[in-house]
């Protein structure tokens, strides 16, 4: 155990240790939250990623997962550095806090930037995906994503079911007389899309575009808020770490 020059220094260092220990606990919990949000985003939204032109949404989630894992590992290091009072461990802990701060800030900014251009991207890309790529050879993943999108959000077409009338899929022989894909149906059975009546298919104002846009916007805001929120919390941790490191450096003998 270390020895200090004065009782006052001893009390101050112990006080800083307790503050840093409390911070590190909440920091570790925050890391678990960041990791959970990142994994949940990818697992729950992975089915929709194929209909997005940009990879920014997925990139933000992967960055959050990386940051969450790094936070939890760093948290364990922090507990050790505080208990053992090792200046080298505290320096490493501070550097890792700084790296994580920058990583989470980047993830939060990416989510915010993508949120700003989400509407325009969806309008351009979703219409083209439905018209040109759905049901085509080599586009199995896109087809599955659109089917899941229409079933999950109970919608049909980008803006309305009429969007399907001029799609490549509906004009092909393989459509077997369907007016819309079967995934537009309220109860999905083979070739149910041959009857495009409101009692049979989803007729939603704004179509899938409006619902997907709102869905992604909500989760981008959540990702951004979690990333930036935990990053701001880390500023307190870096300040406390510097203070403790400085005290230990001054008063050890």
Curated annotation (Swiss-Prot):
InterPro entries: Tetraspanin/Peripherin, Tetraspanin_animals, Tetraspanin_EC2_sf. The chain crosses the membrane at residues 19-39, 63-83, 93-113, 220-240. The keyword DNA repair does not apply. It is a multi-pass membrane protein. It is found in: Membrane. Keywords: Glycoprotein, Membrane, Transmembrane, Transmembrane helix. It holds the Pfam family Tetraspanin. CDD domains: CD151_like_LEL. Its main location: membrane. The keyword Transferase does not apply. One of its GO terms (cellular component) is plasma membrane. Glycans are attached at residue 127. Belongs to the tetraspanin (TM4SF) family. This is Tetraspanin-11. It comes from Homo sapiens.
């Amino acid at each position: 155990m270390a020895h200090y020059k004065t009782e006052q220094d001893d009390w101050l260092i112990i006080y800083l240790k307790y503050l840093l220990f409390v911070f590190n606990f909440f920091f570790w919990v925050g890391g678990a939250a960041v990791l959970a949000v990142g994994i949940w985003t990818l697992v729950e939204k992975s089915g929709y990623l194929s209909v997005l032109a940009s990879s920014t949404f997925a990139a933000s989630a992967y960055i959050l997962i990386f940051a969450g894992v790094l936070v939890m590992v760093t948290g364990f290091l922090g507990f050790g550095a505080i208990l053992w009072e090792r200046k080298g461990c505290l320096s490493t802990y501070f550097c890792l806090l700084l790296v994580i701060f920058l990583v989470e800030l980047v993830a939060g900014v990416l989510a915010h930037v993508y949120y700003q251009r989400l509407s325009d991207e969806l309008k351009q890309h979703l219409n083209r995906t439905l018209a040109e790529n759905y049901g085509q050879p080599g586009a199995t993943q896109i087809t599955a994503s659109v089917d899941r999108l229409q079933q999950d959000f109970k919608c049909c077409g980008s803006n309305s079911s009429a969007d399907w009338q001029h799609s490549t899929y509906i004009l092909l022989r393989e459509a077997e007389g369907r007016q819309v894909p079967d995934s537009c149906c309220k109860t999905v059975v083979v070739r149910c899309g041959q009857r495009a009546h409101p009692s049979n298919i989803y007729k939603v104002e704004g179509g899938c575009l409006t619902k997907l846009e709102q869905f992604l916007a909500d989760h981008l805001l959540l990702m951004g808020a979690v990333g930036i929120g935990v990053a701001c919390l880390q500023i307190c941790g870096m300040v406390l770490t510097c203070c403790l490191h400085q005290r230990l450096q001054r008063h050890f003998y």
